[in-house]
């Protein structure tokens, strides 16, 4: 923040206000004082001049009351006038008798005007009104201000004998006023200087604490709460400093609490498995966590430059305002690592107390597995319904035929009953397989594990199939000639091998080969047990699906051979329950190899009981 200049500061403004107040006060006082003094001096001067004129009038009146002749009177009046003009301020004095004859005058040319008639209207007005005349004016010739006073001279019986005319200079009066004005101006200037200094000092007592608070506010903006404002007194500014320090402590506590909550929230968001996206009120992304980046398969830099509608791929059908009003969750399909991922997005509006919307929170869940399970469940129900409907439909048709009289036909009745029996057994197998899978799904199963010599165990199973097989298929055994022990449930692994070998025989052509192998991986302590046929094989796109429930590569042929599509699914559950794994390798048209693993031990002290 830039420093405030002196002429823009409070200190200058306070000082200026003080100075202006003094100037206004001194102007008002000065004008009033000067006017009053001027009036007083002029009034005193007029009174003094009138007093002298009255004295002069008295002497002239006495001369006219004397018995002297007119010539003597005129000489005495001239002498009296000359004595009166010895005063510096009297510039001119004249006496005119009632016949308008100038008896005497103090003008330089007074002798010339003496004895002459005057035509000045002032004397006519005085003689007619018997009133004095007084006027002030500025003489442009001499450039001085003068006072003109004319007064009638009357006897005791109020008879006018003449009039006195006086012109007196007022420069002394105005010189005194000039001196007074100079003194007043000097005093005002000195008062202004003292006021300015005092104003600066007083302003600093206010601005210094305010400047300290300003510095503290700047430190608060930087996050520094350690600095305190100094308290200079107990007045309002001191109380403000105390309040400011209290505010600093409160802000520090609030900042610490907010920072703690922010860190907690950041930790929660960072370690959430769900994706979280936050936007501002315009829909621009301001925050998103790592799971959101991973789920959307986008970099953080790219995401922060996109609006949320574009990031979620909704820009063609939705605006940000539509998402704000969105109440239900949405499903998105994102292609990630060449796989389709299904995401569920829930939106929550960030809203202030007064209702203003500040942004949007989007929480993203990966529901690919859930959707897959829902799809599998739907397919499972459809498959079960289909598998049960087919034999039930067949049984119903044959039973209706028998009920309509076919039971009396000795050739048809046994065949219809055999078909009905076969379909019944098929449904029983299907239900048993479903119950077995249900137990695996609910973990409601128990194994009777025991240590078995796997080579001998597998040889017995192969022997059984070799004796009961109907096809002309040759069995090839690639079995190790050493003792290898596994801890298994014989019934369950027998069922696994039965399912695998049965499938190999079903799809093997006449004259084909079925190869049985056991390979040992000593590092992993695993046995690799495989059954290879030379059947029709499995298309490459379907190899991973053969262990799915109800999956058949050739549905018509599998159903014809009596399969339910659950054998390999059950085998997978059983092998995984024994800590192993199972998979298929196939080349279409050349055959299929089913391999599963089991943990083993090289030796076993306990005696092996033959099955």
Swiss-Prot record:
Q: Where are the transmembrane segments?
A: 14-34, 183-203
Q: Key word Transmembrane present in the record?
A: yes
Membrane topology type, per the record? Answer: Multi-pass membrane protein
One Pfam family name from the record? HATPase_c
Q: Which UniProt keywords apply?
A: ATP-binding, Cell membrane, Kinase, Membrane, Nucleotide-binding, Phosphoprotein, Transferase, Transmembrane, Transmembrane helix, Two-component regulatory system
CDD domains on file: HAMP, HATPase, HisKA, PAS
> Catalyzes what?
ATP + protein L-histidine = ADP + protein N-phospho-L-histidine
What is the official name of this protein in its record?
Sensor histidine kinase WalK
């Amino acid at each position: 923040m830039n420093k405030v200049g002196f002429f823009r500061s409070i200190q200058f403004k306070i000082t200026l206000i003080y100075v202006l107040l003094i100037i206004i006060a001194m102007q008002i006082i000065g004008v009033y004082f000067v006017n009053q003094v001027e009036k007083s001096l002029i009034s005193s001067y007029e009174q003094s001049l009138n007093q002298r004129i009255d004295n002069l009038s008295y002497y002239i009146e006495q001369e006219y009351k004397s018995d002297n002749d007119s010539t003597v009177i005129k000489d005495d009046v001239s002498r009296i006038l000359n004595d009166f003009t010895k005063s510096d301020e009297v510039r001119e004095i004249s006496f005119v008798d009632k016949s308008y004859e100038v008896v005497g005058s103090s003008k330089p040319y007074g002798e010339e005007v003496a004895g002459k008639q005057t035509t000045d209207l002032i004397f006519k007005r005085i003689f007619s009104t018997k009133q004095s005349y007084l006027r002030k004016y500025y003489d442009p010739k001499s450039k001085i201000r003068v006072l003109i006073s004319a007064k009638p001279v009357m006897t005791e019986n109020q008879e006018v004998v003449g009039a006195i005319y006086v012109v007196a200079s007022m420069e002394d009066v105005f010189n005194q006023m000039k001196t007074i004005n100079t003194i007043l101006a000097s005093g005002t200037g000195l008062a202004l200087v003292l006021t300015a200094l005092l104003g600066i000092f007083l302003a600093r007592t206010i601005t210094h604490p305010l400047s300290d608070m300003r510095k503290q506010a700047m430190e608060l903006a930087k996050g520094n709460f350690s600095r305190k404002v100094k308290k200079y007194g107990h007045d309002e500014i001191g109380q403000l400093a105390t309040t400011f320090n209290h505010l600093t402590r409160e802000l520090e506590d609030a900042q610490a609490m907010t920072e703690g909550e922010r860190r907690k929230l950041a930790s929660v968001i960072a370690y959430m498995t769900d994706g979280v996206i936050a936007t501002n009120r315009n829909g621009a992304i301001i925050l998103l966590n790592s799971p959101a980046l991973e789920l959307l398969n986008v970099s953080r830099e790219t995401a922060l430059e996109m609006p949320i509608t574009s990031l979620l791929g909704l820009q063609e059908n939705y605006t940000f305002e539509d998402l704000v009003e969105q109440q239900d969750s949405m499903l998105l399909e994102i292609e990630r690592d060449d796989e389709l991922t299904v995401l569920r997005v829930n939106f929550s509006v960030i809203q202030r107390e007064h209702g203003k919307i500040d942004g949007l929170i989007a929480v993203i869940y990966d529901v690919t597995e859930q959707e897959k399970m829902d799809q599998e469940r739907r397919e499972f129900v459809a498959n079960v319904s289909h598998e049960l409907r087919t034999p039930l439909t067949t049984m119903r048709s044959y039973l209706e035929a028998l009920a309509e009289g076919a039971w009396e036909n000795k050739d048809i009745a046994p065949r219809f009953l055999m078909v009905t029996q076969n379909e019944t057994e098929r449904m029983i197998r299907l239900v048993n397989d479903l119950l077995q899978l249900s137990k695996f799904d609910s973990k409601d199963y128990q194994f009777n594990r025991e240590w078995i010599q796997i080579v001998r165990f597998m040889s017995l199973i192969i022997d059984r199939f070799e004796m009961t097989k109907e096809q002309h298929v040759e069995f090839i055994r690639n079995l190790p000639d050493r003792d290898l022990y596994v801890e298994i449930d014989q019934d369950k692994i027998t069922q696994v091998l039965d399912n695998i070998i049965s499938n190999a025989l079903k799809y093997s052509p006449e004259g084909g080969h079925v190869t049985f192998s056991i390979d040992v991986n000593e590092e992993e302590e695993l046995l690799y047990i495989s059954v290879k046929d030379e059947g029709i094989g499995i298309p490459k796109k379907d190899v991973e699906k053969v262990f799915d429930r109800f999956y058949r590569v050739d549905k018509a042929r599998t159903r014809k051979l009596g399969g339910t599509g659950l054998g390999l699914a059950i085998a997978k559950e059983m092998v995984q329950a024994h800590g192993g794994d199972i998979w298929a390798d196939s080349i279409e048209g050349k055959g299929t190899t089913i391999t599963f693993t089991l943990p083993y031990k090289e030796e076993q002290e306990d005696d092996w009981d033959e099955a």
